[in-house]
């Protein structure tokens, strides 16, 4: 019989010594909620929440328990599951050596904004709150990749700028601003805003977007945030696929834990964070976090990760779905596709990356290939493909733009872009339809349909693409040819043209 995950059954779960299940040994009632986290999904629960749990478990940290926040109606599911389990959940780590289970207790509460927006603002403004961390995906920042400015005309931002809506914000920035106003009125320091999203210069972008928002509301608040605020840049890494029913069943059968929403992940985890906190921080360095003083160090790690790991994910997600693959490890098991990924990293991306003292890029690439090949975590292509309009401009297009600038090789990267332009139509090479999960889906599909096998229509979206792409003849020729070949022959029949020794 599986034990329902709860405080009541925690000792029973931990007593299964033959399973070596780690459970919280600290008193979860004897903590303060010093971190408010917006966007509690799989990645947060496998990353920041695990680091905090380790600090509480092994180093006696008690002032940085987490209060989760859900801003969207869809977050009601997470609220309900966590509440039913006393806000605990299980992390399942999978590798070739087998699976381990770890009950995480660092999340102590969860606030659902659609039910009570005031409670969220009050929690962020509370003196005990030192950090508000974010995993809100790229689209949640309302950041124009082309102009590097806030999308101030977006209806959600316009809603939050309206003084009549000051007490009922919709966006993360609306909540952050409202809470910052209260802290200033109370004579408190601003909390640190800690982005944990996959974006180059994520802290700087967060700072600039919040300050831009504040300037439109009250310029004096923008000045206060600029003077006293903390927005660390950070590089985060841990592959975390969507939880499936078989995952839940395995946890119940193998570990005797009845958990409605566990997290499945890999053993590897990494976090490099700039030491730029406004109101104190936990001793993250005690649990393996690389805390660095120089923002350039973070940016270099981040650039390596986004351009190699995340770009490779894109190179598997968009061509892979068109070709009918379902999982990352399936792509890596295909000899031709595996060569394509390796050659893209080595010949097109690696030459554009800065050297980091003590980091062997070839070894890093080999580690990525091993991680991608892990069949036990069953990482789904739809997961790594979602929100493509936020990912491709971050992960792939910058390498293409830099290759244009230095007249470097970019054919494989362009092939990935061509596949993305086909992917947004939601039809694979065999005519099977699939869902395109993207906040810009309608615009992307409209442009892709209008353009056919030509890229000009989709490249006209100025929030995603700059003139450096639209005006480069070499890029336009390569991407047009790739789009025509893919439309006529399919992804896998076209790919050999982009692989040496295919």
From Swiss-Prot:
Gene3D superfamilies documented for this protein: N-(1-d-carboxylethyl)-l-norvaline Dehydrogenase, domain 2, NAD(P)-binding Rossmann-like Domain
EC number, UniProt record: 1.1.1.67
UniProt KW keywords: NAD, Oxidoreductase
Family of this protein: Belongs to the mannitol dehydrogenase family.
Binding site for NAD(+): 35-46
Single GO term (MF): mannitol dehydrogenase activity
KW Ligase (keyword) present: no
Subunit relationships: Monomer.
Name recorded for this polypeptide: Mannitol 2-dehydrogenase
Catalysed reaction equations from the record: D-mannitol + NAD(+) = D-fructose + NADH + H(+)
InterPro entries: 6-PGluconate_DH-like_C_sf, 6PGD_dom2, Mannitol_DH, Mannitol_DH/Oxidoreductase, Mannitol_DH_C, Mannitol_DH_N, NAD(P)-bd_dom_sf
Described function: Catalyzes the NAD(H)-dependent interconversion of D-fructose and D-mannitol in the mannitol metabolic pathway.
Species for this entry: Pyricularia oryzae (strain 70-15 / ATCC MYA-4617 / FGSC 8958) (Rice blast fungus)
């Amino acid at each position: 019989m599986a034990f329902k995950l709860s405080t009541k059954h925690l000792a029973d779960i931990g007593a299964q010594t033959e399973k070596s299940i780690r459970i919280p040994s600290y008193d979860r009632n004897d903590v303060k909620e010093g971190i408010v986290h917006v966007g509690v999904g799989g990645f947060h629960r496998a990353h920041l929440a695990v680091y905090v749990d380790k600090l509480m478990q092994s180093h006696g940290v008690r002032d940085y328990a987490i209060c989760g926040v859900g801003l969207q109606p869809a977050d009601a599911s997470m609220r309900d599951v966590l509440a039913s389990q006393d806000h605990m959940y299980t992390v399942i780590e999978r590798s070739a050596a087998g699976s381990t289970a770890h009950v995480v207790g660092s999340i102590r509460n969860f606030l659902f904004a659609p039910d009570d927006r005031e409670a969220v603002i009050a929690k962020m403004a509370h003196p005990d709150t030192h950090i508000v961390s974010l995993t809100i995906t790229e689209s949640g920042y309302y950041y124009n990749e082309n102009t590097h400015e806030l999308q101030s005309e977006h209806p959600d931002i316009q809603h939050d700028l309206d003084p009549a809506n000051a007490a009922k914000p919709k966006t993360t920035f609306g909540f952050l601003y409202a809470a910052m106003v209260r802290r200033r009125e109370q004579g408190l320091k601003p909390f640190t805003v800690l982005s944990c999203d996959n974006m180059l210069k994520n802290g700087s972008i967060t700072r600039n977007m919040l300050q831009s928002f504040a300037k439109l509301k009250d310029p004096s608040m923008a000045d206060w945030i600029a003077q006293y605020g903390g927005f660390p840049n950070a590089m985060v890494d841990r592959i975390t696929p969507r939880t499936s029913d078989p995952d839940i069943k395995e946890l119940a059968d193998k570990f005797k834990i009845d958990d409605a929403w566990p997290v499945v992940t890999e053993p590897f985890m990494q976090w490099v964070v700039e030491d730029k906190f406004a109101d104190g921080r936990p001793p993250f360095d005690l649990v393996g976090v690389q805390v660095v003083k120089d923002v350039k160090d973070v940016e270099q790690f981040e650039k390596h990760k986004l351009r190699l790991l995340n770009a490779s994910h894109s190179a598997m997600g968009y061509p892979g779905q068109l070709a009918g693959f379902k999982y990352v490890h399936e792509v890596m098991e295909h000899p031709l596709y595996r060569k394509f990924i390796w050659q893209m990293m080595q010949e097109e991306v690696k030459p554009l990356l800065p050297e980091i003292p003590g980091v062997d890029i070839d070894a890093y690439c080999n580690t990525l290939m091993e991680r991608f090949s892990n069949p036990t975590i069953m990482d789904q292509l739809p997961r790594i493909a979602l929100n493509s309009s936020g990912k491709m401009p971050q992960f792939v297009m910058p390498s293409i733009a830099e290759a244009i600038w230095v007249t470097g090789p970019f054919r494989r990267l362009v092939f990935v872009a061509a596949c993305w332009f086909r992917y947004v139509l939601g039809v694979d090479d065999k005519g099977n339809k699939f869902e395109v999960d993207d906040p810009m889906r309608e615009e992307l599909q409209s442009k892709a349909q209008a353009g056919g096998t030509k890229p000009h229509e989709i490249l006209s979206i100025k929030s995603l693409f700059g003139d450096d792409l639209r005006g480069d003849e070499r890029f336009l020729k390569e991407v047009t040819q790739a789009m025509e070949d893919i439309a006529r022959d399919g992804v896998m029949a076209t790919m050999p043209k982009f692989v040496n020794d295919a």
